[in-house]
Amino acid sequence: MSLSAAQKDNVKSSWAKASAAWGTAGPEFFMALFDAHDDVFAKFSGLFKGAAKGTVKNTPEMAAQAQSFKGLVSNWVDNLDNAGALEGQCKTFAANHKARGISAGQLEAAFKVLAGFMKSYGGDEGAWTAVAGALMGMIRPNM
């Protein structure tokens, strides 16, 4: 992964801040994603049992989804210097999402929202965009 040391440090430190607040931040991230991309929210209709978008933020299903996503991003951040682990994680992630009919474009949209969202936690949007690009480089071939 061709990230500078400063980019990696920023991603790690900003993720530590966001992760510590993820009980609140996680649902906020997903609501930002859903508000920006109705097509992504539609992919969660089974999880939320067809509930309206405005009603899902404080549900147990949202809490579980947010924690699952936190674990995924934490694994990616923890392995920024371990290309083999990242590649394996990305292959599994791609297979799981492809099986649910989620497109590479929808994943890219989620990464874009995440990059902007992380600014609230001291994240550099360019660093997060670089990480997203590197991850998508491993995800896209498996979609």
Swiss-Prot record:
This protein's record includes keyword Heme: yes
What are the record's GO terms for cellular component? extracellular region; hemoglobin complex
Q: Name the Gene Ontology biological process terms.
A: oxygen transport
Q: Which Pfam families match?
A: Globin
Q: Which residues bind heme b?
A: 97
Entry similarity comment: Belongs to the globin family.
What job does the chain carry out? Serves to transport hydrogen sulfide to autotrophic bacteria.
* Name the UniProt record assigns to this protein: Hemoglobin-1
State the species of origin.
Phacoides pectinatus (Thick lucine)
